[in-house]
UniProtKB/Swiss-Prot annotation:
Family: Belongs to the distal-less homeobox family.
Biased composition regions of type Polar residues, renumbered to the chain: 1-14
Subunit relationships: Interacts (via homeobox DNA-binding domain) with POU4F2; this interaction enhances retinal ganglion cell (RGC) differentiation.
Gene Ontology process terms (BP): branching morphogenesis of a nerve; cartilage development; cerebral cortex GABAergic interneuron differentiation; cerebral cortex GABAergic interneuron fate commitment; embryonic cranial skeleton morphogenesis; embryonic skeletal system development; forebrain neuron differentiation; GABAergic neuron differentiation
Keyword Hydrolase attached: no
Species name: Rattus norvegicus
GO molecular function, one term: chromatin binding
Gene Ontology CC, one term: nucleus
Alphabetical UniProt keywords: Activator, Developmental protein, Differentiation, DNA-binding, Homeobox, Nucleus, Transcription, Transcription regulation
Protein name: Homeobox protein DLX-2
Length: 83
């Protein structure tokens, strides 16, 4: 998938570069965006895996933090202070 995107990008850039001076920047921008899109797709896949791992780790910590219930302790302490 990545190789095809790279090939397409190079193919587009070649004619775009030799096309016209005025349209060169516009074409270049479009080509770059296309390339970025392909790269983003790969990044998404990697991020998905990373996100999944991070979520799993966070979920592992989540129950521990919830068990601690520090927020519940706050109102209790505040109630005791005014008394």
């Amino acid at each position: 998938s990545t190789a095809t995107d790279s090939s397409y990008y190079t193919n587009q850039q070649h004619p775009a570069g030799g096309g016209g001076g005025g349209a060169s920047p516009y074409a270049h921008m479009g080509s770059y965006q296309y390339h970025a899109s392909g790269l983003n797709n790969v990044s998404y896949s990697a991020k998905s895996s990373y996100d999944l791992g991070y979520t799993a780790a966070y979920t592992s910590y989540a129950p521990y933090g919830t068990s601690s219930s520090p927020v519940n302790n706050e109102p209790d302490k505040e109630d005791l202070e005014p008394e």
